[in-house]
UniProtKB/Swiss-Prot annotation:
Subcellular location: Cell inner membrane
List of residues binding ATP: 39-46
Organism the protein comes from: Rhizobium meliloti (strain 1021) (Ensifer meliloti)
Function: Part of the ABC transporter complex RbsABC involved in ribose import. Responsible for energy coupling to the transport system.
Protein name stated in the entry: Ribose import ATP-binding protein RbsA 2
Lipid bilayer topology: Peripheral membrane protein
Record-annotated ABC transporter domain positions: 7-242, 257-498
Single GO MF annotation: ATP hydrolysis activity
UniProt entry tagged with the keyword Cytoplasm: no
Enzyme Commission code(s) on record: 7.5.2.7
A Gene Ontology cellular-component term: plasma membrane
Family annotation (PANTHER family): CARBOHYDRATE TRANSPORT ATP-BINDING PROTEIN MG119-RELATED, GALACTOFURANOSE TRANSPORTER ATP-BINDING PROTEIN YTFR
C-alpha cells in the first residue's frame, strides 16, 4: 500500500425522497490497498459503492480519481475510469453463457461485426480457471448460486481496472472457494490495484485488509488501521452499542420432548435419498453441510418445490400429500429461499404488497383487497423485525440487502405458519441484524412454530441451533447436539474426513 490516493469521496450525500441514505460522507482509497468498509445493513455502504460505480448519482458532494473531480454518470463511465463492482446480489443474464456474461461489459465498449467468439470463450475460460474449473460454455441459469457468484467475480477480473469493489463476495461461497478468492485479492493488491472490501465477516476483514472504514446510519464514523483495532472495536463502531449476546438462550434439553411438529421418513428425490429426521416443539433444528451437498434440495422436497419419489412427511402426525408449493403453504409449511431476489421478494412491489403476497385471500373481501389491513399487517411485522425503511409503501428495491431479507422473512410469517424452512436466513446480514433475527427465530420456536435453519456459517449453526443435522452427498451423515456440536465435528461429517464416532452420531440411524 502507498500513500497515493487513487479514489476520494468528498462530502457525498444521497437522498431517496425524504430518506437520507448518505449524509456528507468522506472516504479515501490508497493505491494498492485493501480497504474494508463495514457497517450494519442500511448504514450506506452499498449506496456509496453504487455512487462510485455509476449506478447512482450523488445528491451532493464529489468523487475524485487521482485528484481530479469526475462525474460518473453510468456504470459504463465507471468502467472507462477503471472502476469495477462485484455486486452482493447476482446481476447476470441467466439465458446467456458464462463467457458471454463475463465479457458483456467489455464487448459493449468495443463491439465489432467480426467478434471472435471462439477467442472470447478461450479468454473467459482462462479467467474462470483462476477461480474454479467451471465450463464457461454453460448457461448461467443452470448454475447454483455459489457458482453464479464466482461468475460475478470473474466478470470483474476481465476488466482492466484500478479500483475493484467487492460487496460481500464470500456470502455464497464455500470455504475453499473463499480461500481461492483471497489469494486473487492479494495478487491484485501486489499489482497495485486498489480494493474496497465490504464484509460483515470480521475474520476476513482482519486477514485481508489494511484499513477499515465504518459507516453508521448513512454517516461516516471512523477510519482505522486494521492493526490498531480489534474485531470488538469495529463492531462497537458499527452498532454504536455493545452486542452482549448474538445468540439467544437455547431450549433446555428437558423440554425437547413430546410429539414432533414435523416428521420426515425415508424421503428421497433427485440429489437426496433416505432422509429421516424429526423437528420438535420449541427447538431450532440446524442443517449443515457443504454447498452442493443436497441441503437445499431436501428443504425444497419437503415443501413440494421439487419432486419427491419416496418417503413421507407428517405435520403434527398427519401425513402431508403435497403436489405444489401452494399446498405446502396452505398446510402451514413455508420456505425462505437462499436467493432472496430470485424467489424471496418482489423488488418492484411495495413492502406491504410483498408481505401480503402469500395470503391475499385473507385480506380480500368480495374480490377487493383491504389495503388498511394489508398496511396494518406490514407495519406490525416490519416493527417486530426492525426493518429500516421510509414506510411500508416504499418499494423493496429501496431497501438494503439485510432489510430485504427481513421483508422476505416477514412474508413467510404473514401466513401464520406451523413450520418455516429457512435457507441461509442471515446471509449477507450485519451482526446487529443477525442478532435481531436470531432472537426472532427463538421467539417463534418458543411460540410453537417449527424452525429449520440451513446455514453455511458454522458459528450460526452452533450458536443458534439446538441440534444440527449434517448432510453429505444427499444423505444425513450425522446429527450433533450439546457438547459434541463443534466446528470440527460438523466439518468432519460434512466432508467425510475420518470415521464418524458414536459420540458424534445419534443412535437414530443417521450415519451414512
Amino acid at each position: 500500500m502507498t500513500s497515493e490516493t487513487v479514489l476520494e469521496i468528498r462530502n457525498v450525500s444521497k437522498h431517496f425522497g425524504a430518506v437520507k441514505a448518505l449524509t456528507a460522507v468522506d472516504f479515501r482509497l490508497a493505491r494498492g490497498e485493501v480497504h474494508a468498509l463495514c457497517g450494519e445493513n442500511g448504514a450506506g455502504k452499498s449506496t456509496l459503492m453504487n455512487v462510485i460505480a455509476g449506478v447512482l448519482q450523488p445528491s451532493e458532494g464529489e468523487v475524485l480519481i487521482e485528484g481530479a473531480p469526475v462525474k460518473i454518470a453510468s456504470p459504463a463511465v465507471a468502467q472507462s475510469l477503471g472502476i469495477a463492482l462485484v455486486h452482493q446480489e447476482i446481476a447476470l443474464c441467466p439465458d446467456a453463457t458464462i463467457a458471454e456474461n463475463m465479457f458483456m461489459a467489455a464487448t459493449n465498449r468495443r463491439r465489432s461485426a467480426l467478434m471472435n467468439y471462439a477467442q472470447l470463450e478461450r479468454d473467459a475460460q482462462a479467467v474462470m480457471n483462476r477461480l474454479a474449473p467451471i465450463d464457461v460454455s454453460q448457461k448461467v441459469g443452470d448454475l447454483p448460486i455459489s457458482s453464479q457468484q464466482l461468475v460475478e467475480i470473474a466478470k470483474a477480473l476481465t476488466l482492466d481496472c484500478r479500483v475493484l469493489i467487492f460487496d460481500e463476495p464470500t456470502a455464497a461461497l464455500t470455504e475453499t472457494e473463499a480461500q481461492v478468492l483471497f489469494g486473487i485479492i492479494r495478487d491484485l493488491k501486489a499489482r497495485g490495484i486498489s480494493i474496497i472490501y465490504i464484509s460483515h465477516r470480521m475474520a476476513e476483514v482482519f486477514s485481508l485488509c489494511d484499513r477499515v472504514t465504518v459507516f453508521r446510519d448513512g454517516r461516516y464514523v471512523a477510519t482505522e488501521m486494521v492493526s490498531d483495532v480489534t474485531p470488538d472495536d469495529v463492531v462497537r463502531l458499527m452498532v454504536g452499542r455493545e452486542i452482549s449476546q448474538l445468540y439467544p438462550d437455547k431450549q433446555p434439553s428437558s423440554e425437547r420432548l413430546g410429539e414432533p411438529i414435523l416428521s420426515v421418513r425415508d424421503l428421497g428425490g433427485e440429489r437426496f435419498r433416505d432422509v429421516s429426521f424429526e423437528l420438535r416443539y420449541g427447538e431450532i433444528l440446524g442443517v449443515g453441510g457443504l454447498i452442493g451437498s443436497g441441503r437445499t434440495e431436501i428443504a425444497e422436497g419437503i415443501c413440494a418445490l421439487r419432486p419427491v419419489t419416496q418417503g413421507e412427511i407428517r405435520l403434527h402426525d398427519k401425513v402431508l400429500r403435497l403436489r405444489r408449493y401452494s399446498d405446502a403453504a396452505k398446510a402451514g409449511v413455508v420456505y425462505l429461499s437462499e436467493d432472496r431476489k430470485g424467489s424471496g421478494v418482489f423488488l418492484d412491489l411495495s413492502i406491504a404488497q410483498n408481505i401480503a403476497a402469500l395470503d391475499l385471500k385473507a385480506l380480500t373481501s368480495l374480490g377487493l383487497l383491504n389495503s388498511r389491513e394489508e398496511r396494518a399487517l406490514a407495519e406490525d411485522l416490519t416493527r417486530r423485525l426492525g426493518v429500516r425503511m421510509g414506510g411500508v409503501d416504499m418499494p423493496v428495491s429501496s431497501l438494503s440487502g439485510g432489510n430485504q431479507q427481513k421483508v422476505a422473512i416477514a412474508k413467510q410469517l404473514a401466513v401464520d405458519p406451523k413450520v418455516i424452512l429457512m435457507d441461509e436466513p442471515t446471509r449477507g446480514i450485519d451482526v446487529g441484524a443477525k442478532s435481531e433475527i436470531h432472537r426472532l427465530l427463538r421467539e417463534l420456536a418458543r411460540a410453537g412454530i417449527g424452525i429449520l435453519v440451513i446455514s453455511s456459517e458454522l458459528p450460526e449453526l452452533i450458536g443458534l441451533c439446538d441440534r444440527v443435522l449434517v448432510v453429505r452427498e444427499g444423505r444425513i451423515a450425522g446429527e450433533v447436539s450439546g457438547n459434541e456440536m463443534t466446528e470440527e465435528v460438523i466439518m468432519r461429517l460434512a466432508s467425510g474426513i475420518g470415521p464418524a464416532t458414536e459420540t458424534n452420531l445419534k443412535a437414530s440411524g443417521h450415519a451414512a
